[in-house]
């Protein structure tokens, strides 16, 4: 983060990433494939404030979901993040005004991409939460909802709250040091192994590698 005109700016070198190397490699390749389209998607701001480039809705359907997925393993997510995704899904379907053959192909392509990136099971869990909490109709879902995984995800959300700030199952996080936080997060992710084994097992390894990389490459 760094300030620009007194506004905090968070810069990412990639939109998102996965902890499992194979899925992460596929995701980074996909980002490169669609990058030009995202950078050329210009929208006009209201009241004459100019133009900006924004990601397309088909991109956000995948990107925001992957962002939610990553936060499940790095502290937790709250209903406010799920509400954001509800509107992304609704916008995606609004763009597909009629379920024509072309639109069916778009849905099939999206579902194939979610499977390839390792997001299929989590997407089904999210659809269940969006249905139970926000009333998302089944015909508006991007994948069939997964009730079992969805109930587990909703329980995690309700126990932990936004970014897991209310999750005290592994003790009080107030004033914890880096070492304590490392082991707490690693232990926390073990409860996800049965549901999302590749990401849950790779997250501590990724975190260790990234910490080492920063120590060796980032200058102060």
PLM features per residue range, with description:
Residues 1-220:
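Conserved NTP-donor binding/palm subdomain of two-metal-ion nucleotidyltransferases/polymerases, i.e.
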């Amino acid at each position: 983060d760094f300030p620009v005109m007194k506004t905090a700016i968070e810069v990412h070198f990639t939109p998102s990433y996965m902890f499992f190397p194979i899925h992460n490699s596929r995701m980074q390749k996909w980002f490169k494939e669609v990058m030009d389209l995202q950078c050329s998607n210009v929208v006009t701001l209201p009241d004459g404030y100019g133009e900006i480039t924004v990601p397309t809705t088909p991109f956000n359907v995948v990107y925001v979901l992957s962002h939610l997925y990553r936060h499940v393993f790095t502290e937790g997510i709250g209903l406010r993040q799920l509400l954001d995704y509800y509107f992304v899904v609704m916008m995606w379907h609004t763009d597909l005004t009629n379920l024509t053959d072309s639109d069916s192909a778009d849905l099939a392509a999206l579902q194939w991409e979610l499977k390839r990136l390792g997001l299929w099971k989590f997407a089904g869990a999210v659809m269940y939460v969006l249905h139970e909490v926000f009333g998302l109709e089944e015909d508006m879902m991007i994948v069939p909802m997964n009730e079992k995984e969805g109930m587990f995800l909703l329980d995690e959300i309700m126990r932990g709250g936004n970014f897991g700030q209310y999750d005290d199952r592994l003790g009080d996080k107030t004033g914890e040091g880096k070492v304590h936080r490392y082991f707490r997060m690693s232990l926390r992710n073990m409860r996800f192994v049965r549901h999302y084994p590749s990401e849950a097992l790779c997250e501590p390894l990724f975190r260790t590698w990234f910490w080492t990389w920063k120590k060796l490459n980032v200058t102060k």
